[in-house]
Regions:
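Conserved small/polar residues in nucleotide/adenosyl-binding loops
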Residues: 1-5
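Short aromatic-rich membrane-water interface segments that cap or initiate transmembrane helices
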Residues: 56, 67, 112-129, 161-169
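Hydrophobic alpha-helical segments and helix pairs
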Residues: 78-120
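A mid-sequence, solvent-exposed acidic-amphipathic segment
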Residues: 147-190
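Interfacial loop-to-transmembrane junctions
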Residues: 216-236
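Juxtamembrane boundary at the C-terminal end of a transmembrane helix
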Residues: 240-245
Length: 245
């Protein structure tokens, strides 16, 4: 729990560095330090329980925040999207805070040591993390697009990546999220794991949603603004799976 508290503090400081618009390299390094703390917390929990720490809502939310930060660090600098930390850091902070609250006041959940269950849930969480970063890119796209339409470029929009960079990043992240979601489904269905019916329905709908979106992207073409809305909508829809018990 102490490491999670420090992770939350690091997230806030990282957001301040990103929002200041100065020295994005320092902010990126700060987010990397946050990632190290998150990884440490997950390793400690895994050592204590003997399994991947994705047993209850508290651990799942913290693991999700870790995956979002992972994709941010992997793709942020590579695709000139480091500034998306302005959106990513608050999302990580909210997920970490919710994880802490649920961990403090919720009952401890006993998990299973089945490797396939752990792999299934872990890969699915990584899919949601990629979808979360795609949603962040979508929000940034809408902001940048609105600034260009008004021909007014405030300080925040000056820091955002170009429209084409954001659009290309959304396409890549949607594809990554879709492939990871398929991999998670395969791990679950290959071993005939007992999965909640409502959650299965949500995952099937998400798969259809990503499939249709990718078909439009690569076969018919899709305006960037519509793509941004779809990325945000799909991420919100994926979060509904945590509301189902």
């Amino acid at each position: 729990m102490c490491i999670r508290d420090r992770s939350l503090a690091f997230t806030g400081l990282g957001w301040r560095l990103l929002a200041s618009g100065r020295r994005f390299l320092y902010a990126h390094l700060w987010m990397a330090c946050l990632f190290a703390l998150q990884t440490g917390a997950l390793c400690v929990k895994a050592y204590q329980t003997g399994m991947c720490p994705i047993r209850g809502a508290s651990e799942v939310l913290f693991f999700l925040s870790w995956t979002i930060n992972l994709f941010y660090l992997l793709l942020g600098r590579a695709y000139r999207m480091s500034v998306l930390g302005i959106f990513t850091a608050p999302a990580i902070a909210v997920l970490t805070a919710l994880s802490l609250l649920i961990g403090l006041y919720g009952a401890d959940v006993q998990g299973t040591h089945d490797f396939w269950v752990t792999a299934h849930v872990g890969v699915a969480m990584m899919s949601y993390g990629a979808g979360g970063l795609a949603a962040a890119a979508g929000v940034a796209f809408c902001m940048q697009n609105e600034c260009l339409k008004r021909r007014q470029i405030p300080g925040t929009c000056r820091l955002l990546p170009p429209i084409r960079t954001l659009e290309a990043s959304m396409k890549r992240l949607v594809l990554v999220a879709f492939l990871l979601l398929l991999a998670g489904e395969w791990l679950g269905w290959q071993r005939h794991l007992p999965i909640n019916g409502a959650k299965t329905s949500i995952v099937i709908l998400l798969t259809l949603g990503y499939s249709i979106l990718l078909w439009f992207i690569y076969r018919r073409g899709m305006p960037g603004r519509a793509l941004a809305y779809c990325c945000v909508a799909l991420f919100i829809a994926s979060m509904s799976i945590f509301l189902v018990s």
